[in-house]
Amino acid sequence: MVSKSDQLLIVVSILEGRHFPKRPKHMLVVEAKFDGEQLATDPVDHTDQPEFATELAWEIDRKALHQHRLQRTPIKLQCFALDPVTSAKETIGYIVLDLRTAQETKQAPKWYQLLSNKYTKFKSEIQISIALETDTKPPVDSFKAKGAPPRDGKVPAILAGLDPRDIVAVLNEEGGYHQIGPAEYCTDSFIMSVTIAFATQLEQLIPCTMKLPERQPEFFFYYSLLGNDVTNEPFNDLINPNFEPERASVRIRSSVEILRVYLALQSKLQIHLCCGDQSLGSTEIPLTGLLKKGSTEINQHPVTVEGAFTLDPPNRAKQKLAPIPVELAPTVGVSVALQREGIDSQSLIELKTQNEHEPEHSKKKVLTPIKEKTLTGPKSPTVSPVPSHNQSPPTKDDATESEVESLQYDKDTKPNPKASSSVPASLAQLVTTSNASEVASGQKIAVPATSHHFCFSIDLRSIHALEIGFPINCILRYSYPFFGSAAPIMTNPPVEVRKNMEVFLPQSYCAFDFATMPHQLQDTFLRIPLLVELWHKDKMSKDLLLGIARIQLSNILSSEKTRFLGSNGEQCWRQTYSESVPVIAAQGSNNRIADLSYTVTLEDYGLVKMREIFISDSSQGVSAVQQKPSSLPPAPCPSEIQTEPRETLEYKAALELEMWKEMQEDIFENQLKQKELAHMQALAEEWKKRDRERESLVKKKVAEYTILEGKLQKTLIDLEKREQQLASVESELQREKKELQSERQRNLQELQDSIRRAKEDCIHQVELERLKIKQLEEDKHRLQQQLNDAENKYKILEKEFQQFKDQQNNKPEIRLQSEINLLTLEKVELERKLESATKSKLHYKQQWGRALKELARLKQREQESQMARLKKQQEELEQMRLRYLAAEEKDTVKTERQELLDIRNELNRLRQQEQKQYQDSTEIASGKKDGPHGSVLEEGLDDYLTRLIEERDTLMRTGVYNHEDRIISELDRQIREILAKSNASN
């Protein structure tokens, strides 16, 4: 056992945050994860300074703590923005705490900046402290008396007054259940489970404009059960979603009444279909039907709410999606069950198979029971039977599709060596008698007499002139079923090809032996080209088809024939053709991406002899077994001659061999039939699957096109209405145009008439004006003469006025008036200067008062500091007084003498200043008396006296000076002297 002192608590205090943006519709949550255990704070408002004020603690002993510190186990805190409406969590950032910084002594909290912060414009920070505390939890008693549960039918008074909004689910980690309601009264145990069983028509949730991740998008269902986020296993196929039904269960401790109230508040369970962090659709399952008022079903058996619920797209996608018909609506099969703990039930969900008897909203689906775990592993590749030589080869598109599928199968699984044995290798033993296109058609193959034995070889030499901007690891792949095998032929290993380089391909030579008629060979070569696919093989991702090269095999038929001798001495013919063909891009525009150099050879070995070819089940390939009659044995013994022929060992061995051959033929035929049946079944299932996929896609497209057709019909009707409106507007425009034309002609005629009349009026007016001008010329001459006479009179009068003005300026009254004007201007200027000086003086007094107050404060502070220094010096001097008394007395005498000299000099200086001020005041007073105007001097004395009194009062109000100060005494003396002078003058 671990001692009590070894039990510790790792306490992480999450206090507050700062530099967060304001999001009123969101909440902030911080989740902390350590050693696989996750804790979270309560949601707080998403403000700029959120207040968390939460402590999160993990129990640990010292040994485990030491181990975690050695391993540098971090404590990761993730901050989320929570949407209370949709319960969607949005990652904001995270913080990583080092466990080694936690100490048992209390440490000051620190600010930690969020890493990978979503709010890039804000440097969001959270104040956190981490510490170790001794676990002081009281020991758990092995036995405690528990309160008896309330009797049925009686609700305690405390529950009757409980606010329904205060009923929440609280996780009890020690007991492993959620407590709903007061723990002392709600003691019944329940199990609540949610099962997602199936889903259909999910492709309807994805609009045509939406883009999904390119590489295997994963879809899953998400829901929150009592605050626990639950997701099912991801699946990739939306058209045929294949996933195992999963049940999520939680234990609840409550009572029936409280649980009913809680379910009434949390009335709906929302389930989302997600792809990554994006919700494609959601549905709501009502929970109020689990516990109906007054019902006691839950005491006898589990209560359930189940069915196929329609998935609705989110608001942002609903605007882009067209309305979906009811029969094509996406649905999800969900069952929510609630039962008392301890009641035995076989299954909380009973999934039924309903065909024609089910209601309208269920779409004839077979729901898989929960107990059945339908494994969805990779399917084994289906090997289609090899067509015989008289079957028509597939078209180009079909061949390409089958080749892509077979390449995927080759990547996923390794083919059975018996099922996909090398056809050329097995037929090489037949020399010139086997037909490669008839390997899988039966055990006995009849070759027509007109068929020739051909050998076709192809050598893909090199890839050059690459036009792709990145290096590729290329392999070449092709298939030509006419040669007897639909299996793809590939080069291996992949070679790296870069731009402006030529790379020779390894293992690129392949030869095919087959029997066919020359005209059929020529017809096939003319119709069907050989498609060579260029693939980029990537270890980190799926292989990529880059392009396809088309090799026209008919070119070899027009090449020159050369004669050679076969292995049996017969005359044979050979044709060879070499060429470089472009590789066309598989996607996008038909641009050349590379060039492929190849060499093909066709050898004709002549007619195939009429015979039957037997195919055995040997793993070495196909072999023809021909028994020739053995020659007579030399010198037989008499005992051997008398023995029956059927009893000889040779006959028995031959008989056993024939029986074994027949048995092997039967076994091989059965195996072929079983393989054919399995392959046909797999092919049929795949065909049905693809047919269903195509049918669902066609239905979806038909629904979309129907909606588009309706829109087009509506648009067409609108266009017809618009055309009619335009026609009516055009006719109205023509009518108005004619009216405007006639109006224009009428206005033009009126304008011509008015111009003619205006011309006549103008001619008459010109004649009148000419007469007026002649009259005005005469008046002008007369007035010009009068003007000359008036100018002469004006000059005479102006000269007389100038003489009179000069006479008036010489008089004294005029000169005095001008001086008065000048003095008035000077007076105004002096008054302005006086007012400015008065304002400056007042400002100076205010500044001087402030300076005096500041000086008093500084003086007081200096006195206090001097007193403190003096006290300190006195203490020091008291200690040294006895030792340095004589020297100190001498220094004191010198210092006092110096101070007396300084005081004497200061007194002399003050006396001189007083004398100077007295002389100035005397001069002022005498000057005022001796002036020509006595009243003006008295006014100057009064002003000077007033100024002195104001200065004295101002200095006294500052609090720095008193009546004993020298400057105040001097001001009082001057005031008394001026008062005495004024009294004497009076």
Swiss-Prot record:
Chain intervals with Polar residues compositional bias: 377-394, 915-924
Disorder named in the UniProt entry: Short-rib thoracic dysplasia 13 with or without polydactyly: A form of short-rib thoracic dysplasia, a group of autosomal recessive ciliopathies that are characterized by a constricted thoracic cage, short ribs, shortened tubular bones, and a 'trident' appearance of the acetabular roof. Polydactyly is variably present. Non-skeletal involvement can include cleft lip/palate as well as anomalies of major organs such as the brain, eye, heart, kidneys, liver, pancreas, intestines, and genitalia.
Region (Disordered): 350-424, 914-937
Recorded superkingdom: Eukaryota
InterPro entries documented for this protein: C2_dom, C2_domain_sf, CEP120-like, DUF3668
UniProt subunit comment: Interacts with TACC2, TACC3, CCDC52, TALPID3.
Family note: Belongs to the CEP120 family.
Residue numbers of Phosphoserine PTMs: 935
Keywords for this protein: Ciliopathy, Coiled coil, Cytoplasm, Cytoskeleton, Disease variant, Joubert syndrome, Phosphoprotein, Repeat
PROSITE patterns linked to this entry: C2
Any one of the GO CC terms: centrosome
Effect of residue 549 to V: In JBTS31; uncertain significance
Subcellular location: Cytoplasm, Cytoskeleton, Microtubule organizing center, Centrosome
Source organism of this protein record: Homo sapiens (Human)
One Pfam match: C2
GO process terms (BP): astral microtubule organization; centrosome cycle; cerebral cortex development; interkinetic nuclear migration; neurogenesis; positive regulation of centriole elongation; positive regulation of centrosome duplication; positive regulation of cilium assembly
Effect of residue 194 to A: In JBTS31; uncertain significance
Protein name listed in UniProt: Centrosomal protein of 120 kDa
Span of domain C2: 1-112, 433-566
Protein function: Plays a role in the microtubule-dependent coupling of the nucleus and the centrosome. Involved in the processes that regulate centrosome-mediated interkinetic nuclear migration (INM) of neural progenitors and for proper positioning of neurons during brain development. Also implicated in the migration and selfrenewal of neural progenitors. Required for centriole duplication and maturation during mitosis and subsequent ciliogenesis. Required for the recruitment of CEP295 to the proximal end of new-born centrioles at the centriolar microtubule wall during early S phase in a PLK4-dependent manner.
Coiled coil: 669-925
